[in-house]
């Protein structure tokens, strides 16, 4: 990431800065997600990055762990924040070459299924970035009660694999909902097997469910699967099953290898289509 910045913008124009020291004005903010690291240092750094994005008003480039649509994915998932809004890829039609090279199998849209699968977020700050007025746990309880009330079939609650504290607290009230059970599967795809649809806040698992052909609902309004997944629960009985090729072609431009980042291919794309 640092080598990309220096090679792209020149050493004299780049400052490596610890955002925990406080806000510092910049033209382009480049940061890296903390991934699976749950240490206090990593969490405070990620929270500082989020605050910096909001205060700076600058264009931001965010490097994250890949969204694994195939088993071997040695690339970074990169998105942008511009004017306070997350940008995953441009609105224009994109070439199919990058997505085709991934080699992921696209499954037909599912027409059946036994239950609704709800994939929970990691409630520990700063992983849960929402603009809701309520604290995460209260928001989550209210949402699950709403979902339980409108669902016409059973609901399977999949705990977030890295949300130990939030999972324990939320699961304490789930037994009071007669149509909700808790998954014990480690593998996400095991929970996909009998699901008629997937619901998540803004987890990247919505990408995997779209590829697997499972109708998907996302609660966040700034989500990557916009256009293929419905937002909210209003049309829970009318999921989208649209053509996916255009969206997948665009998604191919979200993940970049280290070589592509360092040698300028990624920046030429970003400069032309994003900035």
Feature-to-residue mapping (PLM):
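Phosphate/adenylate-binding glycine loop and adjacent helical scaffold
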Residues: 42-44, 66-77
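Leloir-type glycosyltransferase catalytic cores
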Residues: 74-114, 227-275
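Short, well-ordered secondary-structure micro-motifs within conserved domains or adaptor modules
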Residues: 15-50, 54-64, 197-201
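Catalytic donor nucleotide-activated moiety binding site of glycosyltransferases and closely related
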Residues: 141-184
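N-terminal pre-catalytic "stem/leader" segment of glycosyltransferase-like enzymes
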Residues: 1-29, 124-125, 268-275
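A donor-sugar binding/catalytic signature common to diverse glycosyltransferases
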Residues: 185-230
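Short loop/turn segments at strand-loop or loop-helix junctions that form parts
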Residues: 32-35, 63-67, 113-127, 159-161, ...
């Amino acid at each position: 990431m640092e080598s990309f910045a220096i090679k792209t913008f020149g050493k004299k124009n780049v400052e490596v800065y610890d955002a925990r020291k406080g806000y510092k004005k910049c033209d382009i903010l480049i940061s890296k997600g903390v991934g699976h690291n749950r240490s206090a240092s990593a969490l405070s750094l990620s929270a500082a990055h989020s605050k910096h994005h909001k205060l700076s008003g600058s264009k931001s480039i965010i490097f994250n762990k890949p969204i694994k649509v195939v088993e071997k994915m040695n690339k970074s998932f990169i998105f942008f924040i511009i004017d306070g809004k997350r940008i995953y890829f441009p609105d224009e039609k994109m070439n199919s070459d990058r997505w085709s090279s991934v080699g992921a199998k696209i499954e037909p849209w599912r027409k059946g299924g036994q239950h609704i699968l709800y994939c929970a977020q990691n409630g520990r700050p700063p992983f849960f970035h929402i603009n809701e007025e309520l604290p995460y746990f209260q928001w989550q309880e209210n949402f699950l009660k709403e979902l339980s009330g409108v669902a016409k079939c059973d609901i399977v609650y999949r705990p977030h694999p890295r949300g130990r504290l939030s999972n324990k607290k939320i699961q304490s009230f789930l037994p009071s909902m007669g149509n909700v059970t808790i998954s014990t599967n480690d593998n996400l795809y095991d929970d996909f097997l009998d699901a008629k649809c997937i619901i998540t806040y803004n987890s990247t698992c919505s990408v995997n469910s779209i590829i697997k052909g499972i109708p998907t609902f996302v609660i966040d309004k700034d989500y990557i699967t916009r256009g293929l997944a419905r937002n909210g629960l209003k049309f829970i009985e009318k999921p989208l099953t649209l053509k996916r090729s255009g969206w997948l072609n665009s998604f191919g431009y979200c993940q970049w290898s280290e070589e592509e980042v360092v040698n300028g291919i990624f920046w030429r794309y970003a400069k032309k289509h994003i900035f």
